[in-house]
């Protein structure tokens, strides 16, 4: 599988273990609505998918309430939660090796792009990525398929006039079903990772091309 030239990475649950900051921010936001969740582990299901979708799915928020929930979430997240976060063991070695081998690395995340850039800069791994593509605050680009399309459009803009992007050379790496489904919506393949917040059933049902258990295994697959 080392014929992939362009590798798109999800951020939360794939590059960084962002669970603590996200779940605490959700806990803070839910408390604003009078919903007390003592065990933040119950909120891990919020890591990865668009926040609006999760509010509506898990707490039956309507659009207006979900919008307010996003605003309150950001109050905590932008002050503290963004950096209640850590890199997965071994992921930097993978990024370094892929970059050295000539692969082009891209981030495609449902997290707001401005937050993604700050986090990657904080951990000094932004240097490995040609493009950092994320959601916008206006929510015109939040769903994973839309973010991946945006990332691919940005990638096409970096190519020479006589170059055409061959989608068979592009692959998405992510830990949740929406990463795999979003990739398929854009006619690219996807690898699921089990060290994040998804599980083997979710990734299998989404039809990931391959499922790996660690960054090291990811490296073995993507490099000769």
Model-derived features with residue positions:
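Substrate-recognition "cap/lid" segment bordering the active-site pocket of phosphatases
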Residues: 114-171, 177-185, 200
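Substrate-recognition element of Asp-dependent hydrolases with the DxDx(T/V) motif
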Residues: 26, 94-120, 129
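Acidic, Mg2+-coordinating phosphoryl-transfer loop and its flanking beta/alpha structural elements
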Residues: 172-212
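Metal-dependent phosphoesterase signature
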Residues: 56-93, 101
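Helix-loop "lid/cap" segments that line or gate small-molecule binding pockets
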Residues: 29-30, 50-63, 119, 147-155
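Active-site neighborhood of HAD-like aspartate-dependent phosphohydrolases
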Residues: 1-45, 59
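Structural recognition of alpha->loop->beta junctions
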Residues: 124-132, 202-222
């Amino acid at each position: 599988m080392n014929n992939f030239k362009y590798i798109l990475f999800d951020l939360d649950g794939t590059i960084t273990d962002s669970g603590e900051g996200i779940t605490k921010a959700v806990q803070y936001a839910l408390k604003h609505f009078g919903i007390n969740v003592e065990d933040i582990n119950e909120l891990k299901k919020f890591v990865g998918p668009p926040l609006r979708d999760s509010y509506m799915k898990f707490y039956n928020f309507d659009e207006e309430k979900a919008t307010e929930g996003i605003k309150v979430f950001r109050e905590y997240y932008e002050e503290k939660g963004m950096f209640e976060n850590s890199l997965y063991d071994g992921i930097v070695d993978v990024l370094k090796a892929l970059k050295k081998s000539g692969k082009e690395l891209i981030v495609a995340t449902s997290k707001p792009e401005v937050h993604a850039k700050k986090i990657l800069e904080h951990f000094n791994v932004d240097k490995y990525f040609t493009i950092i593509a994320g959601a916008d605050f206006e929510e015109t680009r939040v769903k994973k398929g839309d973010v991946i399309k945006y990332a691919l459009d940005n990638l096409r803009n970096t190519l020479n006039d006589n170059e055409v992007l061959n989608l068979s050379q592009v692959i998405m790496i992510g830990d949740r079903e929406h990463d795999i489904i979003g990739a398929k919506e854009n006619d690219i393949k996807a690898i699921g990772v089990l060290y994040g917040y998804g599980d083997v059933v979710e990734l299998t049902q989404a039809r990931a091309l391959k499922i790996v258990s660690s960054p090291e295994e990811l490296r073995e697959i993507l490099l000769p």
